[in-house]
Amino acid sequence: MIQTNIGYNKKYEIIWLVSEKRKFRNQNTGNVKFVTAENKYGWSSPLAYYYGATAGFFFYSHNSAGLNRYRCKGQTVVNLWHGCGYKDAEQGKKKQNIKPDFDYALVPGPVFVKTKSGLWNCEPDRLLMMGYPRYDWMLHPSMSKDEILDSLFGWKGKKVVLWMPTFRKSDLGGCAENEIELPCQLPAIQDMNELKELDSYLREQEIILIIKKHPLQTEWDENEQEFTNIRYVAEALLEKKQIKLYELIGISDGLLSDYSSVAVDYLLLDRPLGYVLADYNIYKEKRGFVFEDPLEYMPGEKIYNVCDIRKFMKHLTDGTDSY
């Protein structure tokens, strides 16, 4: 939105409400400002409230932080949201009879108009079936596959599978996922020996498995030195290398996911997709799903153990994709 070749900044004054303003000191785009909102101490600049109240258009993704609670008449509020997947709303946030704080919200397609209009207690015509801005990075990465792999790991010319497990353990209080016990942080993996054996198999198949750490997941206990073809990636590394997560997704040859919205997003690429469902029953009990039968909405291989992961990798190398 701040790219000058698009030209929005010539028509509008653009205000970005950011938690770390210092990161944008080198941004010198005309008619664009950065204002502190919800920094690490929870503080927001008075300017954030001013612009939040007086802006003609107010966009947010996770929550508005109340910055536009006193908005002026005529302001249009758009909830960009952060993805529609298979998870049900967290306990305590279901069927609340509250008025939504937006005029419009984005969803990937018609099936999610029904689920989100029920969750947010809003009219279906408020939900715009436009997908999410992050799709642009996935469909049109600014770097080539080899450039991204070389920047992150010094690799080139490898087949890449990205594994993006949702969180099971986090520091967030009241999360139903915290009650889910797994033998390993990675669902479908029983212990480190299985992971080492998988690493050996990946080496034979000449596939790199990149495991993206969920930012809410705690208790990661990996030792990359023990592997040749498995690597872990966190937000900090991507930020350091100036690579967007959805660019990394966009250059991958296949994806392992589970109940997250990234699996829905990945359908746009029409590439091999595997759903890791080792804890499906307990997840359904603790968190629940938005669909009565979520398996009907999962057009990819169903994976329950490490043998299924190997099958997925084998299918990737020989070009088998039943979906």
Specify the residue positions occupied by each region the protein language model found.
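Active-site and donor-binding regions of nucleotide-sugar-utilizing enzymes
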Residues: 1-142
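Short, solvent-exposed loop/turn segments at secondary-structure junctions
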Residues: 20-24, 63-66, 83-86, 110-113, ...
